[in-house]
Amino acid sequence: MTFVAASITDNQFDVAIAGGGVVGLVLAAGLRHTGLKIAIIEALPKEQALTKPQAYAISLLSGKILAGLGVWENIKDSIGHFERIQISDNDYRGTVPFAKEDVDELALGHVAEHPVILQALENCVEQCPRIAWFRPAELISFTAGENHKQVTLQQEGREITLQTKLLVAADGARSHTRSLAGIQTKGWKYWQSCVAFTIQHQAPDNTTAFERFCDTGPMGILPLPGDRAQIVWTMPHHKAHTLVNLPEADFITELRQRIGDRLGEFHLINARRLFPVQLMQSDCYVQPRLALVGDAAHCCHPVGGQGLNLGIRDGAALAQVIATAHSQGEDWGSLAVLKRYEHWRKPENWLILGFTDLLDRFFSSHWLPAIALRRFGLEVLRLVPPAKKLALRLMTGLLGRKPQLATGQSLVSQ
């Protein structure tokens, strides 16, 4: 049986995406040239979604995917780019420097504020007449048909029913769609929370990112345009709750004690945000006519800024699997096809989840052998170029299978 795209005159869709955030829109944008009819179901009004005061580390691979989607040119002048990374540890006197030359790239990574990247992706998908938005709308339930899922939404007090050959959960770590599907997760909550905020500073150089490890948790400093920096400060829950509620002057004093004078004079330019840290992996990423992407499938420790990047890779990989199946006349919602996505992404995500968990535990340990071992490890990274390059390729996404979108090729069904 050959599966063809749905007509554009009814509530029948080829792909319905629950969640119109960055990951869901990467998937939709990746499919926009395939001829498939796509529904995006988003609970937040557009104005509210675009006010999220958050910034993300964007890896080299994610940047290449965004370029393949055609949105990079629209955001590259509005985001931060870092050419160097300095890694340091409380129990190590020096720093381990990484540079763009270590991977022969123009930068080591990028930093994008949520409204910038989300608006660019929204503009991209809104140009496609075969993509329909249901917003604000909530997915209430879904049932399985022979070759489709029937999805019930609530929008403006009324219920709407859609049919789709594939439902994709891109609705975050507390995914309602995943819960309705009965998919269990494994993982744990860390003993830490993160305090995230943005500062304005006077450092002469704004092209260096910093990752500072200590026994209470890591701190990441990421450069933003306009002499700004996004800081994610990880620490035990009680300390994080105390810091987020300190008067601003006292908070600045605590921060200066941690980062020293590397950024010169600085001040806060937005509110401090507190969020807990967890590791989570779904037992499965797919069921017949259902797939999970992004935080709906997995969550990791924020050290290294990997979370959103894993989701962007999920979206690009699933788009490729769907487009390939469609071009070959296969049922892109079948379990056999969707397993190709799971077999691609789940092991790679496990690798990063395990690596970030190891980093946090290893650099937080007071055990003397662990302290000695991490000193040795940092020396190896500093002095052995192949080890440095391998670590960089892992954290920038350049190690492993790359989605077609990352090569600059659009996904077009034949």
From Swiss-Prot:
Keywords: FAD, Flavoprotein, Monooxygenase, Oxidoreductase. GO terms for biological process: ubiquinone biosynthetic process. PROSITE patterns: UBIH (PS01304). It comes from the Bacteria. PANTHER family: UBIQUINONE BIOSYNTHESIS MONOOXYGENASE COQ6, MITOCHONDRIAL. One of its GO terms (molecular function) is monooxygenase activity. InterPro entries: FAD-bd, FAD/NAD-bd_sf, Ubi_Hdrlase_CS, UbiH/COQ6, UbiH/COQ6_monooxygenase. This is Uncharacterized protein slr1300. It comes from Synechocystis sp. (strain ATCC 27184 / PCC 6803 / Kazusa). Its cofactor is FAD.
